[in-house]
Amino acid sequence: MADFNQILTPGDVDGGIINVVNEIPAGSNHKIEWNRKLAAFQLDRVEPAIFAKPTNYGFIPQTLDEDGDELDVLLVTEQPLATGVFLEARVIGVMKFVDDGEVDDKIVCVPADDRNNGNAYKTLSDLPQQLIKQIEFHFNHYKDLKKAGTTKVESWGDAEEAKKVIKESIERWNKQA
């Protein structure tokens, strides 16, 4: 398998369209991660079923978040996407998140061309409020059985704030490359 970080760029960040590689399908409790050294997807662990992901979960190639991993993405779609699918996505916001004291922000996006529902989602406020609540609950509690209180959704930001986070992550990637 080719390394997504070698074949895909982050995308047109200023234009709000990014490349996303999906790791975990929405509804899955399998914590699948991209292993950069092996250029392969790896099952890290199986979470309790109650903590299945409320959205697809992936990353933006050629980025590094403050935790040392590629910048995470929450990708909202009607149906789960398979592990390894990559696509262009439209940035609609950012979830500011802390995991065990480390910044671990999540970019929120939808497919760039989703003629079913996604084209209607231009901002976070366009998403169903119940989905926002589910995302917050999930990320505030998914580690509770292991070590309660180690994760916290701190705030939500708009697409412009998300683009800043992406650009900072690209800078970190370029410094280590």
UniProtKB/Swiss-Prot annotation:
PROSITE patterns: PPASE (PS00387). It holds the Pfam family Pyrophosphatase. Keywords: Cytoplasm, Hydrolase, Magnesium, Metal-binding. It catalyses: diphosphate + H2O = 2 phosphate + H(+). InterPro entries: Pyrophosphatase (IPR008162), Pyrophosphatase_sf (IPR036649). One of its GO terms (molecular function) is magnesium ion binding. Its cofactor is Mg(2+). It is an enzyme of class 3 (hydrolase). GO terms for biological process: phosphate-containing compound metabolic process. Mg(2+) 1 binds at D67, D72, D104. Disulfide bonds: none annotated. Its main location: cytoplasm. Mg(2+) 2 binds at D72. CDD domains: pyrophosphatase. Its EC number is 3.6.1.1. It is found in: Cytoplasm. Substrate binds at K31, R45, Y57, Y142. GO terms for cellular component: cytosol. Catalyzes the hydrolysis of inorganic pyrophosphate (PPi) forming two phosphate ions. Homohexamer. Belongs to the PPase family. This is Inorganic pyrophosphatase.
